[in-house]
Amino acid sequence: HASSWGEWKKDLGKDLDLPKGQIRKQLTPLLGYGCLDPSRLGFSARNRAVVIAGGSITKDQRHTYSLPLPLSLRSKAEWHRFTVTLAFAAPTVGTLNQYRGSKVYFEYKEDGTKTAKRSEAEPNMVKKGSLQHEIIEGTRAMTFAEGDAFSIHVECMDDAQHLRKKEEIKYALVASVETAEQTSTTIYDEVRMALRMRARDHVRGRVQG
């Protein structure tokens, strides 16, 4: 989750004289998901919030996760980034060239984040393995209401073989939102508070029901 291309996209795109519209497609096989940044591992930051989830999913099922949008990012024309990483335990088929037995992938809903775009690995290529890692970032102001979220939809489908009915595929999901320290130092606190309120409302609803 702490991997990125850094300055390689700009530098290699220039050095290799790649067409602007082809840079990501040409560099993805070469760079993959980029270089791991050890400084981001095991350390918290007030301008970044990380959420970890996971579970088991069956064919044609969808699981939706909602990462609260921090109000301190609203209507600010400043750099912001969403990073989403999905890994799953795919059953394998050794007798076929297309050995991945199932496909689990995520899509995201751009509530208030239409100004942020995928910036690194090519979106079709990232779905070819069992690890999908995408960075969505931008600098234009986001417009959203209190309580809005960055929604991530995890889905499952057949690939090289037909999954048996109710056959479960295990997966793990990590999502984060961040901005520069000079823009906001309350991202972590805002997301934590929103998640706590959501959990409290969920419990209250179950008790009343």
Model-found features: residue ranges?
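Hydrolase catalytic cores
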Residues: H1-L12
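Secreted peptidase-domain scaffold signal
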Residues: P19-E110
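Residue-level signal for secondary-structure boundary sites
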Residues: K10, T92-G94, A160
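C-terminal edge strands of extracellular/lumenal beta-sandwich accessory domains
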Residues: G101-T113, R140-G209
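Surface-exposed beta-strand/loop patches in noncatalytic accessory domains
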Residues: V93-I135
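Exposed aromatic-hydrophobic patches
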Residues: Y65-L71, K127-M142
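Long internal repeat-built scaffold domains in very large eukaryotic proteins
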Residues: L12, K76, Y171-A175
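Structured alpha-helical bundle/scaffold domains in large eukaryotic membrane-trafficking regulators
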Residues: G13-L18
